[in-house]
Amino acid sequence: MTTLAPASAPLRIGPHTVQPPVVLAPMAGITNAPFRTLCREFSGGKGLFVSEMITTRALVERNEKTMQLIHFDASETPRSIQLYGVDPVTVGKAVRMIVEEDLADHIDLNFGCPVPKVTRKGGGSALPYKRPLLRAILREAVAAAGDLPVTIKMRKGIDDDHLTYLDAGRIAVEEGVKAVALHGRTTAQHYGGTADWDAIARLKEHVPEIPVLGNGDIWNADDARRMMRETGCDGVVVGRGCLGRPWLFGDLVGAFEGTGARQAPSLREVAAVMLRHATLLGEWIGDESRGVIDFRKHVAWYLKGFAVGSEMRRKLAVTSSLDELGTQLAGLDLDQPWPDGADGPRGRTSGNNRVALPDGWLKDPYDCAGVGADAELDTSGG
């Protein structure tokens, strides 16, 4: 076993110290309270675990689903919410609501989502192209947040001909943002190809005043340490790498604290985590069957690399109770060891996409006419 040197300095986001400097990326439909609980259990509570995307309009309107999504376990600290919005006024209202009602300790703003339903409204990773709009949103958010730190997560740009991350980073510094996270891909890439870690290094050089976090292609603890070593970034944001692998956060703690401890669970151990995950979802939703149904999306990620036949996978994909799930899992060859090569890419991998944008979006990065509150989404999560 290789012993790794501990990180040289903790990550500081406003008043919060994040050590080791590891952040769970917000993922719609994934990073709800049950999944965050699992990840925190494996990390011993170390790190920062961000909620799935909350739309500012839905929060201000107190949408029922959204109010559930902002629930935090009593032991979660700091409480971290990611907001999505395209209208500065609505974003400001949402942030003030969070502050006045003590709903979170940290606010992250989403400028990285590449999903067409978001970008075609000028939101997510499309928004930083409109520099004045980005500045206005950040100004409103930071002013409304008061002592709560505001951070942003973004991509390199819309495509290779329309890169925005350096301008966006500078605007973030000027408007009082406490840290920036960069996914080293463009919107057009979605999750395809290879993340550009050199861009993360360039951003760190460009905005030395605040922490820069790197995101993209972190599949194991070695990747995280290598990213920090090669880019000089101050921390890492882990997204798809923890799908079906919540114990990755335990590995990350071991790597950054110098123990090098890694988990290689047998299928029996993985099955136990799967059952606990489904149980937590049912408790959180308040309905066992709905919890198990929601868990189905995770099955393939947990079983990646293990020898599980197509018929058994099909059965697991249609389970609707904990008893049924437990019975199906018990029928697997649970003595299988951790498979070689199981730490590779998971989740969506499509790339080279045509980006859905509002008409005329790319004509002028400083023309924000036509972008208004009607572009706000009224639902949160996945």
Residue spans for each PLM region:
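Alpha/beta catalytic cores of nucleotide-metabolism and tRNA/nucleoside-modifying enzymes
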Residues: 1-18, 22, 28, 149, ...
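Glycine-rich, positively charged N-terminal anion/phosphate-binding segment
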Residues: 2-12, 27-101
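Residue-level signal for pocket-adjacent positions within structured domains
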Residues: 6-8, 13, 22-25, 48-49, ...
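N-terminal small/glycine-rich loop or linker at the start of catalytic domains
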Residues: 14-21, 57-78, 113-123, 143-156
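Hydrophobic faces of well-ordered beta-strands that scaffold small-molecule active sites
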Residues: 22-25, 49-51, 79-83, 105-107, ...
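Active-site beta-loop-alpha junctions enriched in small/polar residues
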Residues: 27-29, 54-56, 84-86, 112-114, ...
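Short glycine-/acidic-enriched loop or helix-start segments at secondary-structure transitions
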Residues: 34, 60, 93, 118, ...
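Alpha/beta enzyme core
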Residues: 38-41, 92-123, 127, 131-210
